[in-house]
Amino acid sequence: MYLIFNTAIQNEEFEKIIGTRNHTEEFTNASGEAMTKEWITTNKFLTGEKDQPEGIQVIGGKTGTTSNAGSCLVLYSKKGEKPYISIVFKAENADGLYEEMTQLLKEI
C-alpha cells in the first residue's frame, strides 16, 4: 500500500483529490438522465472531527473498512516541508483508528 500511495502522491492532481473535503459533480448517466452526485470525505482529520497533532499538516489520505482488514487509513502529511506517509491497518473501529494514527503522527 505504501508503494502505491508513494507513487500516486507524485501526481499533483492526486494530492489535490485526497485533500478534498467534498465534491459535487453533474453528469449524464447511461440512460441519458442528468444526475448530480456529491462525495464527502470520510477522513476525520479533514472534516475536523479529529484534531491534527500539533505541528502536523494532514494533506489527505485513503480510508477503508472491511471485516477482514478492520478500519484502515493511509495518510499523507507534512511536518514543516518534510512529507510523510503513515499507515494504520486493522484498527477495531474508527475511534481506535484515529487514536492509533494520532499517536503515530506524534512520533514524527
Residue ranges and their predicted role:
Residues 2-108:
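Penicillin-recognizing serine hydrolase domain
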